[in-house]
Amino acid sequence: MKHRSGEIGVKNIVGAKVYNIRKKRGIKQKDLLAQLQVLGMDISATSLSRLEGQYRLVQDFEVVFLAKALSITTRELLDE
């Protein structure tokens, strides 16, 4: 797996939180991706990677799916 190098993007505020929570819990990106797809979120591995790297915008419904997949509240993803 490729590790992040250089600066992160600035297109969303939840991406870094998703990445940090996932890493802290030892969840592989492919496992989070599978969980999101089981919940009904249509997202590719590339799109999830860009979301975590803050290189793409996040839709409001995606925040809901991400929170459910990580078993946290949407507020936890949105609070700074």
Residue positions per predicted region:
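Residue-level signal for the short linker/turn that defines the boundary of a DNA-recognition helix
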Residues: 13-16, 27, 31, 43, ...
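DNA major-groove recognition helix of helix-turn-helix/homeodomain DNA-binding modules
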Residues: 55, 59-76
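Short, contiguous strand/loop micro-motifs
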Residues: 5-6, 49-51
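A short, Lys/Arg-rich alpha-helix, primarily the initiator
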Residues: 1-25
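Short alpha-helical DNA-recognition segment
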Residues: 26-50
